[in-house]
Swiss-Prot record:
Reaction(s) catalysed (UniProt annotation): a 3-demethylubiquinol + S-adenosyl-L-methionine = a ubiquinol + S-adenosyl-L-homocysteine + H(+); a 3-(all-trans-polyprenyl)benzene-1,2-diol + S-adenosyl-L-methionine = a 2-methoxy-6-(all-trans-polyprenyl)phenol + S-adenosyl-L-homocysteine + H(+)
Cystine pairs: none
Domain of life assignment: Bacteria
UniProt xrefs under NCBIfam families: UbiG
Family stated for the protein in its record: Belongs to the methyltransferase superfamily. UbiG/COQ3 family.
Lineage: Bacteria, Pseudomonadati, Pseudomonadota, Betaproteobacteria, Burkholderiales
Name of the protein: Ubiquinone biosynthesis O-methyltransferase
Keywords: Methyltransferase, S-adenosyl-L-methionine, Transferase, Ubiquinone biosynthesis
Any single GO BP term: methylation
Pathways involved: Cofactor biosynthesis; ubiquinone biosynthesis
Amino acid sequence: MTTATQSSAPGVNVDQAEVEKFSALAARWWDPESEFKPLHAINPLRLGWIQETAGSLSGKRVLDMGCGGGILSESMAVAGAQVTGIDLAEKSLKIARLHGLESGVKVDYRAVPVEELAAEQPGQYDVVTCMEMLEHVPDPASVVRACAALAKPGGWVFFSTLNRNPKSFLFAIVGAEYVLRLLPRGTHSYDSFIKPSELATSARQAGLEPTGMRGMEYNPITQVYSLSANTSVNYLMSTRK
């Protein structure tokens, strides 16, 4: 995997600029017409894919790494999982907790680096999700290792991120951020995108075996997202420990 040059506290795998970027938008996490509209739109696809692969989430311990305002965390909790959501953007976690209180959905939100949690709770989770997150940290391979450590033997770890090629630059940055304005400008850095082969290598090195991959596409005419076999831009990868 490529590693972007980022500013972060010594020993902590975090890009402070990324944390501040999402903190500035925290109040709008649950507005389906805000900058987070794409996440609301793709969430049913993500949840369905996780359930299709890992089976029912009812009663399972699930970790949502990089949970932000809790969009995926809450939906997995509604599906019956015992969910822990972690993020380093305190403002986003505050919004997640408030929304959980309003909706009556119980999720344990914590501000802790995933590497620290892995040392604290190794092998404790049936399912670990790391969605739209790897491209926002200085050392994605470290996150993959931590996710693997947190999963139980036989547990599932799910990733989603962006492929790195000319098409993904055109679609995910030029198209999504500048033409269609689906995302704020500067949301993504092309150098931080990760090829599926790179993610698969990091997963195997961490003791995870990739089991499947799906692409995610957006139709600007119908404004609908769908899963597909096309992994050239957005893709999801399932792995098992």
